[in-house]
Structures are given as C-alpha cells and as structure tokens.
UniProtKB/Swiss-Prot annotation:
Residues 1-20 form the signal peptide. This is Fruiting body-specific class I hydrophobin fbh1. It comes from Pleurotus ostreatus (strain PC15) (Oyster mushroom). Keywords: Cell wall, Disulfide bond, Secreted, Signal. GO terms for cellular component: extracellular region; fungal-type cell wall. GO terms for molecular function: structural constituent of cell wall. It is found in: Secreted; Secreted, Cell wall. Aerial growth, conidiation, and dispersal of filamentous fungi in the environment rely upon a capability of their secreting small amphipathic proteins called hydrophobins (HPBs) with low sequence identity. Class I can self-assemble into an outermost layer of rodlet bundles on aerial cell surfaces, conferring cellular hydrophobicity that supports fungal growth, development and dispersal; whereas Class II form highly ordered films at water-air interfaces through intermolecular interactions but contribute nothing to the rodlet structure. Disulfide bonds join 33-92, 40-86, 41-73, 93-106. Self-assembles to form functional amyloid fibrils called rodlets. Self-assembly into fibrillar rodlets occurs spontaneously at hydrophobic:hydrophilic interfaces and the rodlets further associate laterally to form amphipathic monolayers.
Length: 113
C-alpha cells in the first residue's frame, strides 16, 4: 500500500516538473522574411493565373512556375521605422527579377504597418 502511494507521489511530481519546464519558442515571427526580401507589391497572384502569364510571357520568364508571382514591387528596407508603410500587398520574395517589376517565389506576410 505504501509503495502505491510513493509511486503516485513520484508520478504527480514528475508531471508537475515537466509542466513547469521552460519551453523555447522556435516559431519565426510573422514579420521576418527568412532568406528573401520584404517587398510592397501592387499585384500578387498565382503563377498559374492568366494575368501572371500575361506578365511573365513578354519578359521571357518561364510560364510553368508554381506559387505566387508579385509585380510592380518596391523593397521595404526599413520595416518598423516611422513613416514606413505599404498600401498594397506586403510579401516576402525569394527571387526579385527585372528591378522589382516581377518577383517570384513570394509569400504574403502581415507586418501590421
């Protein structure tokens, strides 16, 4: 009987210690842009959309892409600085082509600017 009580106390103590252990947050905050660059773009659409094909075709960019294509973009270099804003779609793009005219491999992000 005594051994059952000891086992119960040890089990309860172990559960409390596990619950009290610090947990490290490994999630990347939404406003960070991994290996790409943060851009403010006038237009963001699926690479398979007809509008994207119309933009990519004349620029000799492959039209069998997947993901999002952003166009008419400008970099947001100083995120969080007073006066920095984007009235269009903020995206994180891995490939900035044609001086921001077309950006490939984009993901929408929310910077709360």
């Amino acid at each position: 009987m005594f051994s059952i009580r000891i086992a119960t106390v040890v089990l309860a103590a172990s559960a409390l210690l596990a619950a009290a252990s610090p947990i490290t947050n490994t999630e990347t905050p939404v406003n960070q842009c991994g290996s790409g660059s943060i851009q403010c773009c006038e237009s963001v659409q699926s690479a398979s959309a007809a509008q994207a094909a119309g933009i990519l075709g004349p620029l000799d960019i492959l039209t069998n892409l997947q993901g999002l294509v952003a166009s008419h973009c400008s970099p947001l270099a100083a995120v969080g600085v007073s006066g920095t804003s984007c009235s269009s779609q903020t995206v994180c793009c891995k490939d900035v082509s044609k001086s921001g005219l077309v950006n490939l491999g984009c993901s929408p992000i929310n910077l709360n600017l």
